[in-house]
């Protein structure tokens, strides 16, 4: 326990808050070729690799992911949500924050229905999360 005098001389250090999605907190100025501290809710990037990985125990599946080089020159691993996708190498995608609990190192999600990513086909519920357009009304 510190004395009052010790606290007066050197106060308590505040805790450092670590970001859940650090790649969204950095920008890039291409004129001076330097990183900036401008943050954004989403970022655009180009897929460098698309594949599947297996989740941690006790889950079992083949989860789809993409390695994405962002416009701020960082490279991150992003999860591809939904059933089926049209992504391949050099596809331009939009990523948002949000980790996948059973995939280590995956801290980002790809936004379905934006840029080169198509929405999920035949989806009726939760369409806005998967970039699916409203189905046409059936004729009477």
Curated annotation (Swiss-Prot):
One annotated GO biological process: translation
PROSITE patterns, A to Z: RIBOSOMAL_S12
A Pfam family the protein falls into: Ribosom_S12_S23
Signal sequence annotation: none
GO molecular function: rRNA binding; structural constituent of ribosome; tRNA binding
SUPFAM superfamilies with a match to the protein in the record: Nucleic acid-binding proteins
Domain of life of the organism encoding this protein: Bacteria
Disordered: annotated span: 1-20, 121-140
UniProt keyword terms in alphabetical order: Methylation, Ribonucleoprotein, Ribosomal protein, RNA-binding, rRNA-binding, tRNA-binding
3-methylthioaspartic acid sites (modified residues): 102
Keyword RNA-binding: yes
Ranges of compositional bias, category Basic residues: 130-140
Record function comment: With S4 and S5 plays an important role in translational accuracy.
Subunit structure: Part of the 30S ribosomal subunit. Contacts proteins S8 and S17. May interact with IF1 in the 30S initiation complex.
Membership in a protein family: Belongs to the universal ribosomal protein uS12 family.
NCBIfam families membership: rpsL_bact
Protein name in UniProt: Small ribosomal subunit protein uS12
Gene: rpsL
């Amino acid at each position: 326990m510190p004395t009052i005098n010790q606290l007066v001389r050197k106060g308590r250090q505040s805790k450092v808050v670590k970001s859940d999605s650090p790649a969204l907190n950095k920008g890039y100025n291409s004129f001076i070729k330097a990183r900036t501290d401008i943050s954004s809710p989403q970022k655009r990037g180009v897929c460098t690799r698309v594949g599947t990985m297996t989740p941690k125990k006790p889950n079992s599946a083949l989860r789809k992911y993409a390695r994405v080089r962002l416009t701020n020159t960082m490279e991150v691993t992003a999860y591809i949500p939904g059933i089926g996708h049209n992504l391949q190498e050099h596809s331009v995608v939009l990523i948002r924050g949000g980790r996948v609990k059973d995939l280590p190192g995956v801290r980002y999600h790809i936004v379905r229905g934006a840029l080169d990513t198509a929405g999920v086909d035949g989806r009726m519920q939760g369409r806005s999360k998967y970039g699916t357009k409203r189905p046409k009304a059936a004729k009477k």
